[in-house]
Amino acid sequence: MYKTKIICFLLGILSGLVFAPTFFIPALFTFSYLCYIVQKSQNWQAAAKFGYLFGFGHFLSGMYWISIGVSVYIADFWWAIPFALFGLPIILAFFISTNCTLSFFAKNNKYYQLIFCLLWVLFEWIRSWICTGLPWNLIGYAFSFSEILIQPLSITGIYGLSFIVIYIATSAYPVFSKNFTKLKILLASSMLILTVMVIYGAMRVSTNPTHFTDIKVRLVQPSIPQTAKWDEEEFWHNLMLHINLSEKLEPTDLIIWSEAALVVPDDIPQVKLELLNMLNSTNAILITGGISDNKKHGDKFELYSAMYALDKNNHKLFEYHKSHLVPFGEYMPLKKILPFKKLTHGLIDYKEGNGGLVYIKKYHLKIKPLICYESIFPNFVQTNNEIADVIINITNDSWYGKSSGPYQHFHISRSRAVENGLPMIRVANNGISAIVDPVGRIVKKLNLNEINYIQGLIPQKLTTPTIFSQFGNFAMLLPIVFILLIHYLLSLIFDD
C-alpha cells in the first residue's frame, strides 16, 4: 500500500503536465491508473487516500506558480509562500479524494468508469463556486492546445468538455486488471468520440473563417515588473512607456491598456494632460484598467478595480467595476479573524462591482468586460452574442514570472470566446496579449515578457448564438447522453 501511495502521488504530479504550456497529453492516462486503483481498493478509506495523494500531486504541479505571485513582495509575505505552494493543493486535493471515495462504492457497478467520470465533473463544478470558486485547470483545458478539439465548447461548455476528456483519459483503466472486453469497449468508444470531435471541430473552424469589423484596435503590453508597477519613482516612466507604445503612425480607433495600467486617478491634472495629448494625437478612445472609488469619505469610502473608457474630450464613456475579486489578493476574507493585509498594494480592500455589459456609442460596440480572474468563470462570462459584440479581457500576469500560470490563464480565457461565439481582445501588462476570433483562432498575439503592441481589427462575432451561450451548463448533458449511448451500444457488441 505504501508503494501505491507513492505511485499515486507521482502520477498526480505527472498529470498536472497535461495543461499549458507543456500539454503533455500522454499524462492524461495517469487518470486510468487512478480509476483502476480506486476500484481495487480494499475499503473506502484506502480509495480516499489514493485519491488525495493523486490530487495533491496534481494541484501541486499544476498550480505551483501561485507561490511565485506571493514571493513578489517576499519581505512582507515570506511566511505565506508555503501556504500558497502546499496549502492550496492540500485543500483542493479533497475534491479528488471525495470523488474517489464515492466512486469506490460503485466499484462493482457495470458502469463504474462512467460514474467516476460523472463525479469528476460534478466536483469540478462544485470547485467553481464553493468558497468564491476556483475553476482553474479543469481537465477539459488539456485539449486547448488544439483549436479543433476545443470546438465542442460551443455546445457543451468547459464542464461538458471535461466529461469527454476524463472519459477518454480513464478509458485504459481495464488494462491494469486485464479486462480486455471492457478495454475494447472503452477504447472503441473513445476513438469514436475523438473522431466525432475532430470532424465537428474541423468543420466548425473551416466554415467560420475570420471576418473583421472595421474597428481598429491597438493592444499595449508594457511588461512592467510587478515590483515597479506601484513604485512612485517609476510612475512617470511607466506611464510614458504606455503612451509611447500607444502613439504610433498607424491610425487606430481604440487603444487598450491592461489591468491597473493607471495606478492613480485619471483626473490628476498632469496625468490628465498626458492622456488627452495622446488621445488627441491618435484621435482614439482609450480603454484602460485603473483604480476607482465612489468619491465618498470615511466608512462609506469604497475602492474598485476598474475598466473605463476615455475620449479626447475627457469624457468617460463607461466605467466597469470588477465583480469577481481574488481572495487574499484584492480583499482579505474573514478579516475579523485573519489579521493580515491583502497581497496587492494598499491597505483598503477592493469592493465588488455588479458585472454586466458596457457600450461605446461611437462604434455601436457592445462589450463584455472582464478583468483578470473573471475570465476563468464560464457562467459569469456566459453571454449571448445577440446582445454583445466582443469580450475585452484586461489582466496583469506579471505576478507569475516565467511560470506556467500566464499560459494557463490565456488558454482558459480563450475558451470563453469559443463558448460564446464572441471575439476576445486580451491585453496583459505582462503575459499573453492577443486578438482571438470567435472560434478561438489566435489572430495576433504578443508573448510573455514582450514589450510591444498589437495593431489589428476586431473580429466579427458569429452570426448565430452558440448552444452554450443560450443554455449554459445544462448543455453539458448533451455529451453525457451521447457518451452513455455510445458506451451502451458498444457494450452490446463486445460483451459476452
Curated annotation (Swiss-Prot):
UniProt-annotated location(s): Cell inner membrane
Major localization listed first in the record, in broad terms: membrane
Coiled-coil regions, chain positions: none
Gene3D superfamilies: Carbon-nitrogen hydrolase
Annotated CN hydrolase domain residues: 220-464
Keywords associated with the record: Acyltransferase, Cell inner membrane, Cell membrane, Membrane, Transferase, Transmembrane, Transmembrane helix
Family: Belongs to the CN hydrolase family. Apolipoprotein N-acyltransferase subfamily.
Annotated NCBIfam families: lnt (TIGR00546)
Protein's UniProt name: Apolipoprotein N-acyltransferase
Record organism: Rickettsia typhi (strain ATCC VR-144 / Wilmington)
Lineage: Bacteria, Pseudomonadati, Pseudomonadota, Alphaproteobacteria, Rickettsiales
Record gene name: lnt
